Amino acid sequence: MGKLEVIAHPLIQHKLSILRRTDTSTKAFRELVDEIAMLMGYEVLRDLPLEDVEIETPITKTIQKQIAGKKLAIVPILRAGIGMVDGLLSLVPAAKVGHIGMYRDEETLKPVEYLVKLPEDIDQRQIFVVDPMLATGGSAILAVDSLKKRGASHITFVCLVSAPEGVKALQEAHPDVDIFTAALDDHLNDHGYIVPGLGDAGDRLFGTK
């Protein structure tokens, strides 16, 4: 079973509390999502392999460490996942970015896929799927399904807020996928929203209804 890690760093929790507030502006919400994603990146990327490299300082030659030549890809689930991309890219700027577009049918609560645009060598990359919320788990499962159909095997899911129902569903569907979240909330309401949650992340990111 893939691991579930709740990143409880004080800075992340402080910023997440502001993110949740109803009176947080679109501008502030967007900035906070970016900042939290970057802060989470330190833990999400903790296990990247290192290799020795010889460098020359102003004083002498020395053997130091650098990230090994592991190919990375960040794949946001559109549209809200876009808000997390730059924060992670600031840490690993050489990573490629793919896109998986989905919308949720408000009657069935099921995700509908409308776009898949990925690097050609996605099957060779370590992939970080990003979406601010893991609610029912439907979108996350469908995104991982799409990636695995294209040969991907090393996949991690990164979100800001999650519900126990979504975590359980993703773990059952894809037990090899690790999940990183800034918060594990209480439950889903009758409309499939996370409680206490933060509302509709896409609408709050882009100022839409």
Curated annotation (Swiss-Prot):
GO terms for molecular function: GTP binding; magnesium ion binding; uracil phosphoribosyltransferase activity. The keyword Ligase does not apply. Pathway: Pyrimidine metabolism; UMP biosynthesis via salvage pathway; UMP from uracil: step 1/1. InterPro entries: PRibTrfase_dom, PRTase-like, Upp_B, UPRTase/APRTase, Ura_phspho_trans. The keyword Glycosyltransferase applies. Allosterically activated by GTP. Keywords: Allosteric enzyme, Glycosyltransferase, GTP-binding, Magnesium, Nucleotide-binding, Transferase. One of its GO terms (biological process) is uracil salvage. CDD domains: PRTases_typeI. It catalyses: UMP + diphosphate = 5-phospho-alpha-D-ribose 1-diphosphate + uracil. It is an enzyme of class 2 (transferase). Binds 1 Mg(2+) ion per subunit. The magnesium is bound as Mg-PRPP. Belongs to the UPRTase family. Catalyzes the conversion of uracil and 5-phospho-alpha-D-ribose 1-diphosphate (PRPP) to UMP and diphosphate. This is Uracil phosphoribosyltransferase. It comes from Streptococcus gordonii (strain Challis / ATCC 35105 / BCRC 15272 / CH1 / DL1 / V288).
